[in-house]
Design a protein with these regions (language model features):
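Conserved structural motif at the start of ABC-family nucleotide-binding domains
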Residues: 5, 20-22
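The feature captures the beta-strand-to-loop junction immediately N-terminal to the Walker
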Residues: 36-38
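Helix-to-loop junction immediately C-terminal to a conserved catalytic motif
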Residues: 51
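Conserved ABC transporter NBD signature motif
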Residues: 59-67, 76
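Conserved "ABC signature" C-loop
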Residues: 87-131
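ABC-fold ATPase nucleotide-binding domain signature/coupling loops
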Residues: 119-143, 147, 152-154
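Catalytic Walker B motif of ABC-type/P-loop ATPase nucleotide-binding domains
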Residues: 156-160
Length: 206
């Protein structure tokens, strides 16, 4: 499990323009974090640095005291679930879209997760093939969140992942994530729901 992700003096510039500098923070297992800021402030860039996708930064990023550059990408992929605002849908069954062909995930787990993300209507259609018109944008986004739950990683990073959800579904899902003591939860958002603000251990403003 990832117990801590630590950023020390992290900075990033693009075409000689400084986007941010001297970011110092720690993300710990069982705690909730939000990264906020105006468009262009570098929120998604910071997430890509944390995920190991962007290597053009200054400073240090460590997972459990190991520099991210020393960690195999495949290991990072197994340790962290990332959910963006677009969920990739495979031309396969709904079940395989949720489990990513992991046969160790059983039916009851899938049903439980679909209930958590308010996709109960899809339970009878688990073995139906998914087409582009099969799901609404909001359903696709909730499918992506369900997929992340099912991977059982203890780090969940969401980048504007609630953008296509109505307020009630967004609240339902975020409330569950904020209540989960087994995971480190990091969200990037333009708009945090006010009634959930006190549930974040730290809010990082860029």
């Amino acid at each position: 499990d990832i117990e801590e992700i630590k950023l020390t003096n992290v900075g990033y510039s693009f075409k000689d323009k400084e986007i941010f500098k001297n970011i110092n923070c720690s993300f710990e297992k069982g705690k909730n974090y939000a990264i906020v800021g105006e468009s262009g402030s570098g929120k998604s860039t910071l997430i890509n640095i944390i995920l190991g996708n962007n290597k053009q930064y200054s400073g240090s990023v460590k997972y459990n005291d190991v520099e991210i550059s020393d960690i195999e990408e495949s290991q990072l992929f197994k340790s962290v679930s990332y959910i963006g605002n677009i969920t990739h849908i495979y031309h396969d069954s709904l079940r395989n879209n949720l489990t990513l062909w992991d046969n160790k995930i059983n039916e009851s787990e899938i049903i439980n997760i679909l209930k958590q993300v308010n996709l109960i209507d899809l339970i009878p259609r688990l073995d139906d093939e998914v087409s582009m018109s099969f799901l609404s944008e909001g359903q696709k986004q909730r499918l992506g969140i369900a997929r992340a739950y099912l991977t059982k990683t203890n780090v969940i990073i969401m980048d504007e992942s609630m953008a296509n959800l109505d307020r009630d579904n967004a609240f339902l899902i975020e409330n569950q994530l904020l209540n989960d003591p087994t995971r480190m939860y990091i969200t990037v958002s333009h708009h945090l729901q006010e009634k959930l603000l006190d549930r974040f251990h730290s809010i990082i403003t860029l």
